[in-house]
Amino acid sequence: MAKAISAVNVLIIVSLTVLALSEIAGIVPTYLPHQTAFAKQFGYILVLFVVFHALRNLKFRAPIFLGIAFAAGALSELLGTTYGWIYGQRYYYTASDKVFGLVPLSVLLTWVAVIYLAYSITNIIDPAKNLLALKKVVRVGSFIYVLLLSTLDGFLAMNLDMILDPVYVRSGGWVWQDGGAYFGVPISNFIGWFFVAFAATFIFRVYSLRKPFDTAQKIDFIFFAPVVAYATFGIVKYGVLSYVMGHTEYAVIGISVMFPFIAIATLSYQLKRSTPESTPISLDITKDINLTQKQRVLDENR
């Protein structure tokens, strides 16, 4: 088992390194018209990173999470392109390789990656992962707490789209039927992004709450890696593309809404690394909550 985990860690590091180098080099515009056949192959590196990290993070529950994320993204895209639901109006993709003739497979896989990155970053920020912090945080019940975590997941995904969507609309990757106020993108689109990510992670978090699993994880670089991937995918890739396209305003707004979460996650990671009680942590929030409740009882009896 230790060798298997070590091998997965190596795959995570390799995929993240390739992703970062390829994005920085500007060779991975996966949807843009000027992409090359070589660049297309790198478009799936982020997905591979997510799969490897999920296997390390969630183990046997990784397929459940990834399946929920894929289903949520696919359903929303099919409803959006066909009926204009979820995102406020109809839109269509200009790529030729579409699933059901409506949505490129790369878009569906990107949904999986974005939702997982949002989920993982929230877990890094989550004070419940620092068992002592739960003492004052979790007082309203675990279900409400999960609701708050999923809300943060939704914002993380939505903020990424605030730089992603304008770039692809400008490049002709997809077209909104009636345009929109935000660089040609309707505001309702971002509300849709929020709720799709929220729904996917909420389902999994509630499932985990009802069927707890005890999976401890060290707070090491692998634990922090989703933050690096999120920053690389969003800020580096789309920030550079925005600049190349002559629309730095996309990057300014996108980075402005993404960076605070990246900074908070980085700070949280550093704090947890320096706290002996938080290494390793349990990914089972119910176990964390029970431990904190026991700690509170002990404190009250002192």
Could you say what each language-model-derived stretch is?
Residues 1-302:
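Aromatic-rich, lipid-facing transmembrane alpha helices and their immediate juxtamembrane interface loops
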